[in-house]
């Protein structure tokens, strides 16, 4: 069971909204979100209702302002709890072309720089064979984030991206 608390103001001040399950639109309860406390579980939060727009992955901890979760502004509207599978291994295959074609790169560990490790700047498709992964738009786990659970992603839009730029990625662990 997870629990996340959203606050309108920085440093856990102002009105708050608590969630212990997925919520497709909490904007009616909060006009803005400037701080978050994750009491348990891992969550993906979205800037728009119905789990759309920029996404941010948060684990247990305190985020006193939106820069701490790499947010671009104080707008958040929906959230989903991430469900881990016990004893999960981690394995991902990245492809430099869509539909699982072209050069394939495989990893079982975090990668702070896709360019340094694989000599490519773009991921056009991927298969998450085990575990939960986060793609980042920039090296060293910065920029836009994309949560990828076990499954196949034939093109960047399948994981929520508009372009194939993936500069780093890491495993999401409990």
UniProtKB/Swiss-Prot annotation:
Residues 84-89 are annotated as: Connecting peptide. The gene is crygs. Belongs to the beta/gamma-crystallin family. SMART domains: XTALbg. InterPro entries: Beta/Gamma-Crystallin, Beta/gamma_crystallin, G_crystallin-like. This is Gamma-crystallin S. Keywords: Eye lens protein, Repeat. One of its GO terms (biological process) is visual perception. GO terms for molecular function: structural constituent of eye lens. Crystallins are the dominant structural components of the vertebrate eye lens. Coiled coil: none annotated. Signal peptide: none annotated. Residues 2-40, 41-83, 90-130, 131-173 form the Beta/gamma crystallin 'Greek key' domain. Has a two-domain beta-structure, folded into four very similar Greek key motifs.
């Amino acid at each position: 069971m997870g629990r996340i608390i959203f606050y309108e103001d920085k440093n856990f001040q102002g009105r708050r909204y608590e969630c212990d399950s997925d919520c497709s639109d909490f904007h009616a309860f909060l006009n803005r979100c400037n701080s978050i406390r994750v009491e348990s579980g891992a969550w993906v939060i979205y800037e728009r209702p119905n789990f759309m727009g920029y996404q941010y992955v948060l684990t247990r901890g305190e985020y006193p302002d939106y820069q701490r979760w790499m947010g671009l502004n104080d707008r958040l509207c929906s959230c989903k709890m991430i469900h881990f599978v016990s004893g999960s291994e981690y394995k991902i295959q990245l492809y430099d072309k869509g539909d699982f074609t072209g050069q394939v790169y495989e990893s079982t560990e975090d990668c702070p720089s896709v360019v340094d490790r694989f000599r490519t700047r773009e991921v056009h498709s991927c298969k998450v064979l085990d575990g939960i992964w986060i793609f980042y738009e920039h090296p060293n786990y910065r920029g836009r984030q994309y949560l990828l659970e076990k499954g196949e992603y034939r093109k960047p839009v399948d994981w929520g991206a508009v372009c194939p730029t993936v500069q780093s990625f890491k495993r999401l662990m409990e």
